[in-house]
From Swiss-Prot:
Primary gene name: psmB1
Self-association and partners: The 20S proteasome core is composed of 14 alpha and 14 beta subunits that assemble into four stacked heptameric rings, resulting in a barrel-shaped structure. The two inner rings, each composed of seven catalytic beta subunits, are sandwiched by two outer rings, each composed of seven alpha subunits. The catalytic chamber with the active sites is on the inside of the barrel. Has a gated structure, the ends of the cylinder being occluded by the N-termini of the alpha-subunits. Is capped at one or both ends by the proteasome regulatory ATPase, PAN.
Name the record gives this protein: Proteasome subunit beta 1
Recorded GO CC terms: cytoplasm; proteasome core complex, beta-subunit complex
Pfam short name (any one): Proteasome
HAMAP family reported for this sequence: Proteasome_B_A
Family matches, as PANTHER family: ATP-DEPENDENT PROTEASE SUBUNIT HSLV, METALLOPROTEASE TLDD
Length: 197
Protein backbone atom coordinates (compact mmCIF):
# COMPACT_ATOMS: atom_id res chain seq x y z
CA UNK A 1 0.00 0.00 0.00
CA UNK A 2 1.58 3.26 -1.13
CA UNK A 3 -0.55 6.14 0.04
CA UNK A 4 0.62 9.69 0.49
CA UNK A 5 0.04 11.71 3.61
CA UNK A 6 1.56 14.94 4.80
CA UNK A 7 1.73 17.76 7.27
CA UNK A 8 3.92 20.60 8.38
CA UNK A 9 5.18 21.09 11.92
CA UNK A 10 7.73 23.64 13.09
CA UNK A 11 9.68 24.34 16.24
CA UNK A 12 11.48 27.53 17.25
CA UNK A 13 13.75 28.13 20.26
CA UNK A 14 14.32 31.63 21.60
CA UNK A 15 15.78 32.86 24.89
CA UNK A 16 12.36 33.07 26.58
CA UNK A 17 10.94 29.74 25.45
CA UNK A 18 9.87 27.42 22.68
CA UNK A 19 7.15 27.65 20.05
CA UNK A 20 5.71 24.56 18.35
CA UNK A 21 3.20 24.96 15.51
CA UNK A 22 1.41 22.53 13.19
CA UNK A 23 -1.44 22.44 10.73
CA UNK A 24 -4.55 20.56 11.90
CA UNK A 25 -5.41 18.68 8.70
CA UNK A 26 -5.13 14.89 8.46
CA UNK A 27 -4.93 13.66 4.88
CA UNK A 28 -4.74 10.32 3.11
CA UNK A 29 -3.95 10.36 -0.59
CA UNK A 30 -6.24 12.92 -2.20
CA UNK A 31 -8.72 12.94 0.70
CA UNK A 32 -8.87 15.19 3.77
CA UNK A 33 -9.77 12.95 6.72
CA UNK A 34 -10.28 15.80 9.19
CA UNK A 35 -9.43 19.48 9.64
CA UNK A 36 -9.27 19.24 13.44
CA UNK A 37 -6.46 16.93 14.53
CA UNK A 38 -3.97 17.91 17.21
CA UNK A 39 -0.43 17.29 15.97
CA UNK A 40 1.29 18.70 19.06
CA UNK A 41 1.09 16.33 22.02
CA UNK A 42 2.04 17.40 25.57
CA UNK A 43 4.31 14.86 27.29
CA UNK A 44 4.73 16.80 30.56
CA UNK A 45 3.69 20.30 31.61
CA UNK A 46 6.97 21.58 30.08
CA UNK A 47 7.69 19.25 27.12
CA UNK A 48 5.69 18.46 23.96
CA UNK A 49 6.24 16.64 20.67
CA UNK A 50 4.97 17.31 17.17
CA UNK A 51 3.84 14.55 14.84
CA UNK A 52 4.62 13.87 11.21
CA UNK A 53 4.00 10.32 10.08
CA UNK A 54 2.02 7.39 11.41
CA UNK A 55 -0.58 8.44 13.98
CA UNK A 56 -0.51 5.08 15.77
CA UNK A 57 3.28 5.14 16.02
CA UNK A 58 3.39 8.63 17.47
CA UNK A 59 0.64 7.81 19.97
CA UNK A 60 2.70 4.82 21.14
CA UNK A 61 5.81 6.99 21.44
CA UNK A 62 3.87 9.60 23.43
CA UNK A 63 2.68 6.93 25.89
CA UNK A 64 6.24 5.64 26.33
CA UNK A 65 7.64 9.13 26.91
CA UNK A 66 4.87 10.04 29.37
CA UNK A 67 5.59 6.89 31.39
CA UNK A 68 9.35 7.49 31.32
CA UNK A 69 8.88 11.12 32.41
CA UNK A 70 6.68 10.07 35.37
CA UNK A 71 9.15 7.34 36.36
CA UNK A 72 12.07 9.79 36.17
CA UNK A 73 10.19 12.35 38.31
CA UNK A 74 9.30 9.67 40.88
CA UNK A 75 12.84 8.23 40.99
CA UNK A 76 14.89 11.43 41.02
CA UNK A 77 12.44 13.96 42.45
CA UNK A 78 12.88 16.38 39.56
CA UNK A 79 11.56 16.60 36.00
CA UNK A 80 13.41 15.07 33.07
CA UNK A 81 15.01 17.74 30.89
CA UNK A 82 14.04 18.16 27.26
CA UNK A 83 17.58 17.24 26.20
CA UNK A 84 17.45 14.01 28.25
CA UNK A 85 14.03 13.11 26.81
CA UNK A 86 15.28 13.76 23.27
CA UNK A 87 18.25 11.45 23.86
CA UNK A 88 15.94 8.79 25.32
CA UNK A 89 13.65 9.05 22.29
CA UNK A 90 16.66 8.83 19.96
CA UNK A 91 17.66 5.56 21.65
CA UNK A 92 14.10 4.18 21.44
CA UNK A 93 13.87 4.98 17.73
CA UNK A 94 17.33 3.54 17.02
CA UNK A 95 16.54 0.31 18.91
CA UNK A 96 13.66 -0.22 16.48
CA UNK A 97 15.52 0.63 13.26
CA UNK A 98 14.81 -2.79 11.72
CA UNK A 99 11.08 -2.29 12.34
CA UNK A 100 10.96 1.50 12.62
CA UNK A 101 8.35 3.83 13.95
CA UNK A 102 7.24 5.73 10.84
CA UNK A 103 7.54 9.19 12.35
CA UNK A 104 9.55 12.36 12.27
CA UNK A 105 9.29 14.23 15.54
CA UNK A 106 10.14 17.63 16.91
CA UNK A 107 10.54 17.65 20.68
CA UNK A 108 10.46 21.00 22.41
CA UNK A 109 10.41 22.13 25.99
CA UNK A 110 11.62 24.40 28.73
CA UNK A 111 12.79 22.57 31.83
CA UNK A 112 16.21 24.08 32.64
CA UNK A 113 16.51 25.91 29.33
CA UNK A 114 14.54 26.23 26.08
CA UNK A 115 15.37 23.25 23.84
CA UNK A 116 14.29 22.09 20.37
CA UNK A 117 15.34 18.84 18.70
CA UNK A 118 14.42 17.06 15.47
CA UNK A 119 14.40 13.25 15.34
CA UNK A 120 14.18 11.05 12.27
CA UNK A 121 12.62 7.53 12.24
CA UNK A 122 15.99 5.83 12.88
CA UNK A 123 16.90 7.97 15.88
CA UNK A 124 18.99 10.65 14.20
CA UNK A 125 18.95 13.60 16.60
CA UNK A 126 19.66 17.26 15.84
CA UNK A 127 19.39 20.05 18.40
CA UNK A 128 18.83 23.42 16.73
CA UNK A 129 17.30 26.89 17.06
CA UNK A 130 14.53 26.08 14.57
CA UNK A 131 13.38 23.10 12.57
CA UNK A 132 10.47 21.69 10.55
CA UNK A 133 9.07 18.26 9.69
CA UNK A 134 6.61 16.84 7.21
CA UNK A 135 5.82 17.31 3.55
CA UNK A 136 5.76 21.10 3.83
CA UNK A 137 9.28 21.32 5.28
CA UNK A 138 10.93 23.04 2.26
CA UNK A 139 8.39 25.87 2.37
CA UNK A 140 8.45 26.26 6.16
CA UNK A 141 12.25 26.19 6.41
CA UNK A 142 12.53 28.95 3.81
CA UNK A 143 10.39 31.21 6.01
CA UNK A 144 12.22 30.22 9.19
CA UNK A 145 15.66 30.84 7.66
CA UNK A 146 14.58 34.27 6.45
CA UNK A 147 12.90 35.39 9.67
CA UNK A 148 14.77 33.75 12.55
CA UNK A 149 16.98 35.87 14.79
CA UNK A 150 18.48 34.74 18.11
CA UNK A 151 17.07 37.84 19.83
CA UNK A 152 13.44 37.23 18.79
CA UNK A 153 10.90 37.63 21.57
CA UNK A 154 8.39 34.87 22.22
CA UNK A 155 5.52 36.71 20.47
CA UNK A 156 7.60 37.38 17.34
CA UNK A 157 8.71 33.74 17.34
CA UNK A 158 5.05 32.69 17.49
CA UNK A 159 4.24 34.97 14.54
CA UNK A 160 7.15 33.44 12.59
CA UNK A 161 6.01 29.87 13.34
CA UNK A 162 2.47 30.67 12.17
CA UNK A 163 3.83 32.33 9.03
CA UNK A 164 5.97 29.25 8.26
CA UNK A 165 3.08 26.78 8.59
CA UNK A 166 0.79 29.13 6.65
CA UNK A 167 3.33 29.32 3.78
CA UNK A 168 3.56 25.53 3.69
CA UNK A 169 -0.24 25.27 3.62
CA UNK A 170 -0.35 27.60 0.61
CA UNK A 171 2.06 25.45 -1.44
CA UNK A 172 1.89 21.88 -0.10
CA UNK A 173 -1.38 20.09 -0.89
CA UNK A 174 -0.99 17.77 2.12
CA UNK A 175 -0.64 20.62 4.65
CA UNK A 176 -3.82 22.20 5.94
CA UNK A 177 -4.40 25.89 5.35
CA UNK A 178 -7.44 26.57 7.53
CA UNK A 179 -6.22 26.26 11.13
CA UNK A 180 -2.88 26.09 12.99
CA UNK A 181 -2.25 24.61 16.44
CA UNK A 182 0.32 26.62 18.39
CA UNK A 183 1.94 25.62 21.69
CA UNK A 184 4.08 28.10 23.62
CA UNK A 185 6.35 26.74 26.36
CA UNK A 186 8.10 29.12 28.74
CA UNK A 187 9.50 28.90 32.27
CA UNK A 188 5.93 29.59 33.42
CA UNK A 189 4.45 26.55 31.67
CA UNK A 190 2.66 25.53 28.47
CA UNK A 191 -0.12 27.31 26.58
CA UNK A 192 -2.05 25.91 23.60
CA UNK A 193 -4.06 27.95 21.11
CA UNK A 194 -5.57 27.56 17.67
CA UNK A 195 -5.23 30.18 14.95
CA UNK A 196 -7.88 30.20 12.21
CA UNK A 197 -6.59 31.45 8.87
Amino acid sequence: MNRKTGTTTVGIRVKDGVILAADTQASLDHMVETLNIRKIIPITDRIAITTAGSVGDVQMIARILEAEARYYQFTWGRPMTTRAMANLLSNILNENKWFPYLVQIIIGGYVDEPTIANLDPLGGLIFDDYTATGSGTPFAIAILEEGYRKNLGIEKAKELAIKAVKAAGARDVYTGSKKIQVVTITKDGMKEEFVTL
